[in-house]
Amino acid sequence: RSLEIMKDSRLGSYGVMALVMALLTKVVLLATVLDKMTPYWGPVPAVILAVAMHVLSRFAPLVLMHNLAHVGLAASSKTLNVAGQQLGWRGLITGAIWTLPMVALLWWFGSGWLILKIAIACSVTTWLLQRWLRKRLGGMTGDCLGACQQLNELAVLLAVAVHVLRPVL
């Protein structure tokens, strides 16, 4: 039943509410972080944070593509590998390599603690979503990958906010 509902392209009231809440949470977290960081470092953190949250959050769906089977129609799927199979280790490692420049920039600009907080937040978010998807759907679809990316974007922002507000933790 869940897969049938996900095929419907219309957006329901819960979908709208989830999008609005996610957007408002991002705005609040960004405003909080930038309010703390901008007086000290100027606009540079805003640019780095905007790029970091996009780059780092896009690695998590690759983990789902590697670990979960696709449960939708394979013929119309855009989430399967070009070869028509799950993402292999080579694809996952390639994705990890593409995230390394951002990790290096965060290391240089931030600290190892910031990277650790982001890694923990994204790992826990992805692991919990993966468990839920495996139990609920038996795998993943393209919608699940989009949700994973958005949740991990929020996780990156939350980790940065925790780091900026409580740098000792």
Language model regions located:
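Aspartate-rich (DDxxD/NDxxD/DxxxD) Mg2+/diphosphate-binding motifs
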Residues: 1-15
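Hydrophobic alpha-helical transmembrane segments
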Residues: 14-140, 144-169
